[in-house]
Amino acid sequence: MSGNTLGRLFRLTTYGESHGAGLGGVIDGCPAGIALDEAVIQRELDLRRPGGNSASTTRQEPDRVRLLSGVFEGVTTGTPIAFHVENVDQRSRDYGEIARLYRPGHADFTYDAKFGVRDYRGGGRASGRETLSRVAGGAIAQALLARHGIAVRAFTVELGGVPADLVDVAGAQLRPFFSPDPDVVEAWEDMVRTVKGEGDTLGGIVQVEATGVPAGLGEPVFDKLDAVLAYALMSVGAVKGVEVGAGFEAARMHGSDNNDPIVPSGFFTNHAGGILGGISNGETIVLRAAVKPIPSIAQEQITIDRDGKPSALFIAGRHDISAIPRIVPVLKAMTALVLADMLLMQRRMATPQP
């Protein structure tokens, strides 16, 4: 299997499966002298840890990270940064039936078609648990970005078709579902309970914002900043669509409305989402990701077995009702990883000033 590395100069390579011994990764290309310790990474991992909310699986994983290399006396050394997290609450017996059956909405069929073999325990490498390594790597990227005044935040703007108002984005991280709207939380909680009782699941929309990004990041033509960000977000298994700025709403606007007037202090509006011509323009980068419902539902489903014979399937095991809120720090991490890479590329390739 290839495709386990993201980035050119700031590179994350990940490893591990849902029910294997553990998961982890290696960051290569991080400059020396960045303040970093296990606590910095742990704070981000705790935001996506299972069992922490009403929509989450009951699987209890402490997700304690160990830094194996690349950090000395609280700062990065410029060498590869390796980290590892052990799996401790696997229950592989729940997955015995799907060794021969394909779960609708999962990667079981396509992994078999590609590799001829698959780790059926919890989805193996295709499990959402794989994103743990992304969050750990993203925490390191955020430490680098912070030195340059760049911050990334993410929050839920819609769950199960019920939107949130952007009332208090700053406080979203402290609320259930990372909601920017205190008044919508109860409705979301009620909906999760109802859908869970029906044996079903929910999707939603997550918004990611990056502030302090200087103008000039992005490498046209094929490495446009928005293209690489969309690539990174779409690499997360549950994401089925990405918008930048006004996104699909721009298709319903006139040019006179969509254009962002330029004033001495910057841009008067931000329909472009902070990116023009694939290059950051100094405004806040605004992204939205459409998150599909979790495919593991507590209902009988129609499928086939490995021999192509029709079958019925009822999925056991412990599963999220929604990828939200646990996917929120994942999307923040992916955005940070791309920005860290683009920042280093810009520093290397920038034209010297006279």
From Swiss-Prot:
Keywords of the record: Amino-acid biosynthesis, Aromatic amino acid biosynthesis, FAD, Flavoprotein, FMN, Lyase, NADP
Gene Ontology molecular function: chorismate synthase activity; FMN binding
Subunit details: Homotetramer.
Protein name as it appears in the record: Chorismate synthase
A UniProt-annotated Pfam family: Chorismate_synt
Physiological role: This reaction introduces a second double bond into the aromatic ring system.
Similarity-based family: Belongs to the chorismate synthase family.
Entry EC number(s): 4.2.3.5
